[in-house]
Curated annotation (Swiss-Prot):
Its cofactor is Mg(2+). This is Enolase-phosphatase E1. Keywords: Amino-acid biosynthesis, Hydrolase, Magnesium, Metal-binding, Methionine biosynthesis. Binds 1 Mg(2+) ion per subunit. It comes from the Bacteria. Gene3D superfamilies: 1.10.720.60, HAD superfamily/HAD-like.
């Protein structure tokens, strides 16, 4: 079967890892305390904080359990207590859905204030537009929240690219390293997995997508943490993707 859908990762695939690690993550960490204090009455934030509390209650990590007990011993209020957990999640680089949702809210605030602009790889915009013109369906699957994904493409150095994508998936769909997540995506977009090409800079994610029946491409670039493509076909620029369509 021919490829009709592209399922595309973000970090290390369409934008440099450095933009996420040196701009987005530090901005969210720096703004965490003030955002929680300023928006604690917002319903969306309350829902995120409740989810974080559920995650914390079920977190088996010894360090997390110690933190939980320490905050109780200090009689911290809810906001100050949950902030401690978010800071812990950030420091251990946990792929927490509640944290990702909160970061999306903080980044939304930053984009709106003009304090953040997304930086993509030089060829990304033209490649996305070219594939869109070819009537390929473009979807995003990233560990960042769907809100964060849309913000990133809405506020790029090349303008608003959000309209080029048909579907958005994050960790609410499932872990990116689990085959079931990709099967769920194929079902969601009503497409045979063999017609979907997944592009990522992570070998384990490519393994999981491949196990679901999807075609895969491994994004191998300087600066990407994972430099081992395993058995997956390699691209060094998004322009290389066309060879496999």
């Amino acid at each position: 079967m021919s490829i009709t859908h592209l399922l595309i990762d973000i970090e290390g695939t369409t934008c440099p890892v450095s933009f996420v690690s040196e701009v987005l993550f530090p901005y969210a960490k720096q703004s965490l305390s003030s955002y929680l204090n300023d928006h604690q009455e917002d319903l969306d934030l309350k829902n995120i904080l409740q989810e974080a509390e559920r995650e914390w209650d079920g977190d088996p990590s010894p360090d997390s359990i110690k933190l939980r007990q320490a905050t109780r011993n200090q009689n911290l209020n809810f906001i100050d207590s949950i902030k401690v957990y978010f800071e812990y999640l950030i420091n251990v680089d946990r792929k927490s859905t509640a944290l990702k949702d909160l970061q999306g809210k903080i980044w939304d605030n930053g984009y709106r204030k003009g304090e953040i602009t997304s930086h993509l790889f030089n060829e990304t915009t033209e490649c996305l537009k070219r594939w869109h013109r070819r009537q390929l369906s473009l979807s995003v699957y990233s560990s960042g929240s769907i809100q964060a994904q849309k913000l990133l493409y809405r506020h790029t150095n090349d303008g608003d690219l959000e309209h080029l994508f048909d579907h958005w998936f994050d960790t609410h769909t499932g872990n990116k390293k689990e085959c079931a997540s990709y099967r769920k995506i194929a079902t969601k977009i009503s497409t045979n997995p063999s017609e979907i090409l997944f592009i990522s800079d992570n070998g384990e994610e490519c393994d999981a997508a491949g196990a679901s029946g999807m075609e895969t491409l491994f994004s191998l670039r300087d600066g990407n943490p994972d430099q081992s493509p395993r058995s997956h076909r390699v691209i060094k620029t998004l322009n290389d993707v066309d060879e496999y369509l």
